[in-house]
């Protein structure tokens, strides 16, 4: 029997830290291979995927600022890191025979195609994965903010925010074993409880554009499939 698909178009946000490893040139090929396998399964089911990848495994603008760099420059270095990660995933997808196209918010001729909403939509409709790089192209905005903007522009059914824990907790579950996992939250709940999900700019962007967010544990090798076929009790849904 054909599985019922809950989300036909998604925006997947993955932290660059997932790509990092102490082995194999600092690239976590095991994680990437599993991710590509999940993406291929979803595209075969007809799911349209937009992907925003962070750059924290290489450079993080806020960290570079701590060593004396101007934030306007350090953020650009961080944004360039997302381009490198995007190219990495793009190449892995090509090897796996997954159609994909990499877009940049700024002109990077010969490396990425300049982002335009119509081109991105056309890419998705052709069953290609659209990889969005270089954030929003301006400093002081995170890749979470970029994910919310791109998710809104491509009219994604949901923003899937991959994390290393099972969802949103009352406090850090790694430090506090008694932390409570929330299954459903409103955007206002996040702000009122001061929960650490994403920066508030990103959260407000999602709230104003009515973009639901699902926070989940990316280390489950079948998690994207479970989310897409509407398996219950996964992660924390924010709307």
UniProtKB/Swiss-Prot annotation:
One GO MF annotation is: UMP kinase activity
Keyword Ribosomal protein in record = no
Q: Which residues bind UMP?
A: 55, 75, 136-143
Regarding activators and inhibitors, the annotation says:
Inhibited by UTP.
Family statement drawn from the similarity comment of this UniProt entry: Belongs to the UMP kinase family.
Spell out the subunit comment. Answer: Homohexamer.
Question: What is the protein name stated in its UniProt record?
Answer: Uridylate kinase
């Amino acid at each position: 029997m054909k599985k019922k698909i809950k989300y036909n178009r998604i925006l997947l946000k993955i932290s660059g830290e997932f790509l990092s490893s102490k082995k194999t040139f600092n690239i976590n090929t095991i994680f990437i291979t599993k991710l590509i396998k999940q993406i291929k399964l979803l595209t075969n089911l007809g799911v349209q995927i937009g992907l925003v990848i962070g750059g924290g495994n290489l450079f993080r603008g806020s960290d570079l600022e701590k060593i004396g760099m101007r934030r306007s420059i350090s953020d650009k270095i961080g944004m360039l890191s997302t381009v490198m990660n995007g190219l990495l995933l793009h190449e892995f997808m090509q090897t796996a025979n997954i159609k994909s196209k990499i877009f940049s918010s700024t002109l990077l001729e010969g490396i990425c195609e300049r982002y335009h909403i119509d081109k991105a939509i056309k890419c998705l409709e052709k069953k290609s994965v659209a990889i969005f790089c270089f954030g929003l192209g301006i400093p002081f905005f995170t890749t979470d903010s970029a994910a919310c903007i791109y998710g809104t522009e491509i009219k994604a059914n949901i923003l899937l925010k991959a994390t290393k824990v099972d969802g949103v907790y009352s406090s850090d579950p790694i430090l506090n074993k008694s932390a409570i996992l929330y299954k459903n939250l409103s955007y206002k709940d996040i702000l009122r409880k001061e929960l650490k999900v994403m920066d508030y700019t990103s959260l407000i962007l999602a709230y104003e554009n009515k973009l639901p967010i699902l926070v989940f544990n990316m280390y489950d090798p079948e998690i994207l499939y479970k989310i897409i076929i509407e398996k219950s009790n996964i992660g924390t849904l924010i709307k």
